[in-house]
A protein has these predicted regions:
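N-terminal glycine-rich dinucleotide-binding loop that anchors FAD/FMN and/or NAD(P) in oxidoreductases
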Residues: 38-55, 186
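NAD(P)-dependent Rossmann-like dehydrogenase/reductase catalytic/cofactor-binding core
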Residues: 163, 214-300
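Internal alpha-helical scaffold of NAD(P)-dependent oxidoreductase catalytic cores
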Residues: 32, 86-87, 110-119, 128-233
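Short, well-ordered alpha-helices that flank and scaffold nucleotide-derived cofactor binding pockets
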Residues: 12, 16, 82-86, 109, ...
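NAD(P)+-binding Rossmann beta1-loop-alpha1 motif at the extreme N-terminus of oxidoreductases
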Residues: 1-45
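Rossmann-like NAD(P)(H) cofactor-binding subdomain of soluble oxidoreductases
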Residues: 47-132
């Protein structure tokens, strides 16, 4: 559900490997996929065309799925989940590839906690034009797992399908921590690149912006730890070192959306840190600043 950069990439890889995948799309993207198929462009791996492709704008026409890959924008989570609820069977699994750490709380309230597996996607993609997903680099990693930390028949089955499709998939025994590990870096990357209108390179080189990057992540770690997530106290230091090793041109989807005049997910990124921090009594002034600066672009 959601055939943009993330959903289109993972769904396309699975479909190309022979899995029975139905894409849900709308507008020009839907029309292009119906006429031309789904094209995944990658300068390194080569292009992949999925044609014919099963695509619809009516989820009910897809029947009862074994798995719902949930990849819509965060503000659509509740409405889309309620739309999909009638087609979910008693054994339908739900795996969200969205950003943030509160998505599964929303989904669990609609599908039931037992339906959920937690997931984290590591990939650089966007829709370059209708029917076409552009993938940057070779990274297409997906870490997922059951919330009880145990292996299950459905997680093992999905792992096998993902690996067959060439996706760098792995099972996590502490998916909540895995979600917060990605969230910590994403909060820093998105908050700095979008608010400063630049890529990670200049951010990490300037002492003031480097400190701001670190503090954004430090606040996220403090909130996560207060919520009981098993993050090391110095995890922000680790993520800052990680930031030093990524390409200077690395950017965030939040900044990409800002440049293109799209609605922003800042309410669930920096804003999420602020709201969760308020619940557990952790001050988050840097994330509050990012949220305040970008809030007008987050509401259309």
């Amino acid at each position: 559900m959601g055939s943009g950069g993330v959903g289109g990439l993972y769904g396309g890889r699975l479909a190309s490997a022979g899995c029975d995948v139905t894409f849900v799309a709308r507008g020009a993207h839907l029309a292009a996929m119906r006429e031309h198929g789904l094209l995944i462009e990658n300068a390194t791996l080569g292009d992949t065309l999925v044609k014919p492709v099963k695509v619809t704008d009516d989820p009910a026409s897809a029947g009862t799925p074994d798995l719902i890959l949930f990849a819509v924008k965060l503000w659509d989570t509740e409405a889309v989940a309620k739309l999909l609820k009638p087609i979910a069977g008693p054994h339908t699994a739900v795996l969200s590839l969205q950003n943030g750490v509160v998505k599964d709380d929303i989904l669990g309230g609609i599908f039931g906690a037992s339906a959920l597996m937690g997931g984290v996607a590591y990939v650089g993609t966007h829709i370059s034009r209708p029917g076409v997903i552009n993938q940057v680099g070779t990274l297409q990693r997906l870490v997922f797992g059951e919330y009880d930390g145990k292996k299950s028949a459905r997680s093992e089955q999905l792992l096998a399908a993902l690996l067959k499709a060439g996706i760098q998939a792995e099972l996590s025994t502490d998916i909540r921590r895995t979600l917060w590990e990605k969230y910590t870096f994403l909060v820093g990357l998105s908050g700095t690149t979008a608010s400063m209108r630049t890529t990670i390179g200049p951010v990490r080189e300037n002492p003031q912006t480097r400190a701001f990057l670190h503090d954004l992540m430090k606040e996220a770690v403090a909130v996560g730890r207060a919520l009981g997530v098993a993050l090391p106290e110095d995890y922000a230091d680790d993520r800052l070192k990680f930031a030093d090793g990524v390409p200077a041109t690395m950017d965030s989807s939040l900044h990409h959306d800002l440049k293109n005049g799209n609605r922003l997910e800042v309410e669930w990124l920096a804003g999420g840190v602020v709201r969760l921090g308020q619940k557990v009594g952790v001050a988050t002034p840097c994330n509050r600043a990012v949220w305040d600066v970008l809030v007008l672009a987050s509401h259309f």
